[in-house]
Design a protein with these regions (language model features):
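Tandem repeat scaffolds
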Residues: 1-131
Length: 131
């Protein structure tokens, strides 16, 4: 477990890293690439992602609470059970990622792209009854 609180990362590549339980809380991640990383139970709380991407990462049960992810490139990630409460995720495309059991703020879902199955799951989480 590594704790990198309030750090600045620019043009960093995290490739096949094991970041389980690590904390990047309140850090700036600018032009960073996370590729094929494993990091369940990690914290990206209140992080700011600028021109960054996450691809093929397994980050189940991690926290992105209050993070600024707007427009971050997301592809084929596992976000199962993650906390996105209060996060700015506008413009993010979760359609190729697993978000089973993830928690989102209702207001944050505007302009977020999800696939059909994810839309049904999110509707249930929001208390909608689909008939």
């Amino acid at each position: 477990n590594i704790h990198m609180y309030d750090c600045t990362f620019k043009q960093c590549s995290f490739d096949k890293c094991r970041i389980t339980g690590s904390s990047f809380s309140e850090s700036l991640l600018e032009s960073c690439v996370f590729s094929d990383c494993t990091g369940p139970y990690s914290s990206f709380g209140a992080c700011t992602f600028k021109k960054s991407s996450l691809k093929d990462c397994t980050l189940n049960e991690s926290s992105f609470a209050d993070a600024k992810l707007r427009g971050t490139a997301l592809k084929n990630n596992v976000f199962s059970g993650c906390d996105f409460g209060g996060a700015d995720i506008g413009g993010c495309d979760f359609s190729s990622s697993s978000i089973s059991g993830a928690r989102f703020s209702l207001s944050a879902l505007k302009d977020v792209k999800v696939n059909y199955e994810q839309a049904i799951e999110l509707a249930k989480l929001l208390g909608l009854k689909i008939v």
